[in-house]
From Swiss-Prot:
Keyword Signal: yes
Pathway given in the UniProt record: Glycan metabolism; cellulose degradation
Localization annotation: Secreted
Record keywords, A-Z: Carbohydrate metabolism, Cellulose degradation, Glycoprotein, Glycosidase, Hydrolase, Polysaccharide degradation, Secreted, Signal
EC number assigned by the record: 3.2.1.21
Active site: 285
Catalytic activity as recorded in UniProt: Hydrolysis of terminal, non-reducing beta-D-glucosyl residues with release of beta-D-glucose
Protein name as it appears in the record: Probable beta-glucosidase F
GO CC terms of this entry: extracellular region
Species of origin: Aspergillus oryzae (strain ATCC 42149 / RIB 40) (Yellow koji mold)
BP GO terms, sorted: cellulose catabolic process
GO molecular function, one term: beta-glucosidase activity
Region (Disordered): 725-748
Length: 866
């Protein structure tokens, strides 16, 4: 999330995190009453990884000469609505560092103009196409750079989709850690290739929208996650994305194991910065900052948007309060220096010191001129929107993603593709436009017309929208449209007529409630919105041939109509963005064969899921959200519980057929030890003088013109703050300035580099055995042996590759690599990744879904077709 309406922001409230629990060595599995996040201090310094050495050297030279005010300026936001972006830091003009602009969203520039509204993350995941994941990242980065955004707030790999009703699952790439990992890491590589900084989010456990934030009434919920589940499931995509070089990580609102993420020292210091070797800076989600000294010591580097518990009052936990904390000694100057060095090093690492644009847009108004600081009572005005067009040819990428994500679930009697002269009757408002205007609802906070994205801060304005109605009318010579959610009277149906029924299911962020759903799908559940099920059934009674097109944020129930004889075909078009119409007609009329695959499971009933993944209501006191299902979410649960879903994870049909033959398993690097080779030692980190700065460095400059509510680093009485340094600060239990031994699972960005040694490689020949062109996806799942002594899911997606467009009879050999980490479990005692020696007992499966396996391999025995 980033900025949201002021009246909702006022609900934010300071609640101290729980930091005084009995000592524990690991995050073992516990009941909620025992959930505990152990202390991990001090915060590790950045700069010890060679890939970042040059950037840190440049940062060190600059930070060494900064004043206290200049340092604090870069760590703190200037206040909500106090600039053009969702958030901005202060600046250091003396060294050419501007106010850094942090802005949404993961699918395009939010609240701007002349930008691309790309398909959502869940749509990208459904492509199973690594090239498109990267290309979208490049497009996002180019548009962020073009608008002068230093830090684009995305991608999102958390939530992962633990809760099917969760409001923001659609911002990520699917309900699997590996799919999320590829989506996140490739997006980051693409974005940062342009010089824009990616902010990976939300770390961690923000799997439900309701009750995530602390308020005047209660504390945000605690996601209670055991150590193994944390590493193997929720942390997995973060580790891969850190390995990709993420410049920033955004901390979530909620608690993890009863410690607020923004001041959870185990999570930030211990796991993210030490074990995963993260070299960039850690930033809060908007208004997730709930403590000053505690968060600094826990490893937080930047506060956004800078305000305190109640925004718009000009208060802050940092800004001048951080200046005070450094002067009185409660925050060590070493910690501040590392905070600033991480920020400046990231700025240098992405080359933003070289002709990077300043913001040329305003997220606060569409007018050309307006207040420069809208959150101030009195603000100077000027040009705030220059209407810079940053779209380039990104519409091509957007259309390709939306098209290649479309997932064909059912196609009885090959009713699809359609012919241009077929008699078509189209039903449902989801086929049309929002009659109030395509951008009439703030942050897409309504469900009117075709569903292009969910709602909330993860959205973008549509530069244009080609609806399915417009696209079909442009192609079909005989189409009749009924843009209504009630089946109309008097509709005639010929024996060969085809009805196309459009339905959808929406969700979003919890600061907006749409049709009774406060972010999460509380009221609608997993059912279609706007009478969708009844509309399909009514069409099925009238027509012999019905095609259902679904735009949805995630799993949707189909049981009321899926088995009706006249429902011949079902397409899931996910959330297609601006190219909703053209991408759909590309598939409907057969210009392309569908090649999308489900990035989640579609159940028969919500009761098919474990009870623990349901939405949780607000009791008196803090909600304890216990992850008692452990590793078993989505398809992993269905397999373990022996429940056959309506459609399995990875399912997707084509207009053609494919054969998988000639499988081969190669040993690339022997797994001759259970644990990876010893980690590389840490390199040196920048050092600075440890003396406290002079109090005069944060005195108000003479004749300074203050902007009301703008957050500054200056103190009215800095000498008084320094005089209080003799007082003893009540540090959290376990706080120390003595560095901890380097964790054995670390050693580089993402962890021990030996974890990414390719151990096995599977080659398989994919042949188009049908009569139409098409693309196939080979999905690789691993099954780990019981000899590891742990219960593991019977199938875990670890790799996938997609063929080029294959003509009828054409073949392509795909290579799918398997790493040491892919075959490892997290050892909570040793605190390292453990694999079966020599891969003994490992089974590898390749197929077109988790339930449609075409190749089976056993390490040491070879492969066979199934």
């Amino acid at each position: 999330m980033a900025a949201f309406p002021a009246y909702l922001a006022l609900l934010s409230y300071l609640v101290p995190g729980a930091l005084s629990h009995p000592e524990a060595k690991t995050l073992t599995s516990r009941a909620s009453t025992e959930a505990y996040s152990p202390p991990y201090y001090p915060a590790p310094n950045g700069g010890w990884i060679s890939e970042w050495a040059s950037a840190y050297e440049k940062a060190h030279r600059v930070v060494s000469n900064m004043t206290l005010a200049e340092k604090v300026n870069l760590t703190s936001g200037t206040g909500i609505y106090m600039g053009p972006c969702a958030g901005q830091t202060g600046s250091v003009p003396r060294f050419g560092i501007p106010n850094l602009c942090l802005h949404d969203s993961p699918l395009g520039v939010r609240n701007s103009d002349h930008n691309t509204a790309f398909p959502a993350g869940i749509t990208v995941g459904a492509t199973f196409d690594k090239d498109l994941m990267y290309e979208r990242g490049v497009g996002l980065g180019e548009e962020a750079r073009g608008k002068g955004i230093n830090v684009l707030l995305g991608p999102s790999v958390g939530p992962i989709g633990r809760k099917p009703r969760g409001g923001r699952n659609w911002e990520g790439f699917g309900a699997d850690p590996s799919l999320q990992a590829f989506g996140g890491s490739l997006t980051i590589k693409g974005m940062q290739s342009t010089g824009a900084i990616a902010s990976l989010k939300h770390l961690i456990g923000n799997e439900q929208e309701q009750h995530r934030m602390s308020s005047v009434i209660t504390q945000g919920y605690s996601s209670n996650i055991d150590d193994r589940t944390l590493h193997e499931l929720y942390l997995w995509p973060f580790a891969e994305s850190v390995r990709a070089g993420a410049g920033s990580v955004m901390i979530a609102y909620n608690d993890v194991n009863r410690s607020a993420c923004s001041q959870n020292s185990k999570l930030i210091n211990g796991i993210l910065k030490d074990e995963l070797g993260f070299q960039g800076f850690v930033v809060t989600d908007w208004l997730a900052h709930i403590g000053g000294v505690s968060s600094a010591l826990a490893g937080l580097d930047m506060s956004m948007p800078g305000d305190g518990a109640i925004p718009l009052l000009g208060t802050s936990y940092w800004s001048w309060e951080l200046s005070r904390s450094v002067l009185n000694g409660s925050v060590p100057v070493e910690r501040l220096n590392d905070m600033v060095t991480r920020i400046v090093a990231t700025w240098y690492k992405m080359g933003q010191d070289k002709d990077y644009p300043l913001p040329n847009f305003s997220s606060n108004t569409e007018d050309e001129t307006g207040p420069l600081y809208p959150g101030a009572l009195f603000s100077p005005s000027g040009i705030v929107n220059q209407y810079v067009n940053v779209q380039g040819n990104h519409n091509v990428t957007a259309r390709a993603i939306a098209r290649d994500a479309i997932t064909l679930l059912k196609n009885n009697e090959n009713v699809l593709p359609l012919k241009r002269n077929d008699t078509l009757k189209i039903f449902g408002t989801d086929a049309g436009t929002n009659s109030d205007g395509i951008n009439s609802c703030t942050d897409k906070g309504c469900n009117k017309g075709v569903l292009t994205m969910g709602w909330g801060s993860g959205t973008s304005r549509l530069p244009y929208l080609i609806t399915p109605q417009e696209a079909i009318a442009n192609i079909s010579s005989n189409a009749e449209f009924h843009i209504t959610d009630t089946f109309p009277l008097g509709v005639t149906a010929g024996p060969d007529d085809i009805a196309i029924v459009f339905i959808n299911s929406d969700s979003g962020e919890n600061y907006i409630t749409v049709d009774g759903n406060p972010g999460d799908r509380t009221l609608a559940g997993l059912h279609a919105w706007h009478n969708g099920d009844n509309l399909v059934k009514a069409a099925a009674e009238k027509f012999s041939n019905v095609v259902v097109v679904v735009h949805t944020v995630g799993p949707i129930l189909m049981e009321e109509w899926i088995d009706l004889d006249s429902v011949k075909a079902v397409l899931v078009a996910h959330l297609p963005g601006q190219e909703a119409g053209w991408s759909l007609t590309d598939i409907l009329f057969g210009d392309y064969s569908p090649s999308g695959h489900l990035p989640y499971t579609i159940p028969h009933s919500e009761s098919d899921y474990p009870e623990s993944v349901g939405l949780i209501a607000q009791p008196f006191g803090q909600i304890q959200d216990d992850y008692t299902e452990g590793l078993y979410i989505d398809y992993r649960h269905f397999l373990k519980a022996n429940i056959t879903p309506r459609y399995p994870f990875g399912h997707g049909l084509s207009y053609t057929t494919f054969n998988f033959t000639e499988p081969n398993l190669s040993i690339i690097k022997a797994l001759d030890t259970a644990y990876p080779a010893a980690r590389p030692p840490k390199g040196s980190t920048p050092t600075y003088p440890t003396a406290k700065p002079d109090a005069s460095e944060v005195a108000w400059p003479k004749n300074f013109n203050r902007i009301w509510r703008y957050l500054y680093p200056y103190l009215d009485n800095p000498e008084g703050a320094a005089a209080n340094s003799s007082k003893t600060y009540p540090y959290p239990d376990g706080y120390t300035t003595e560095p901890k031994p380097a964790p054995r699972a670390g050693g580089a960005e993402g962890g021990n580099p030996a974890l990414w040694d390719v151990t096995f490689s599977v080659q398989v020949k994919v042949t188009n055995t049908g009569s139409r062109d098409g693309r196939a996806v080979a999905q690789l799942y691993v099954e780990l042996p019981s000899s590891l002594g742990l219960d593991t899911p019977s199938r875990q997606l670890r790799q996938f590759e997609k063929t080029k467009i294959l003509a009828a009879g054409e073949s392509e050999v795909l290579t799918l690599d398997v790493t040491r980490k892919d075959l490892s479990v997290w050892d909570v005692v040793v605190q390292d990744w453990k694999a079966p020696v020599n891969g003994e007992g490992v089974k590898i499966w390749v197929g077109e879904s988790v339930a449609d396996l075409r190749v089976g391999c056993v390490v040491g025995e070879g492969c066979s077709t199934l």
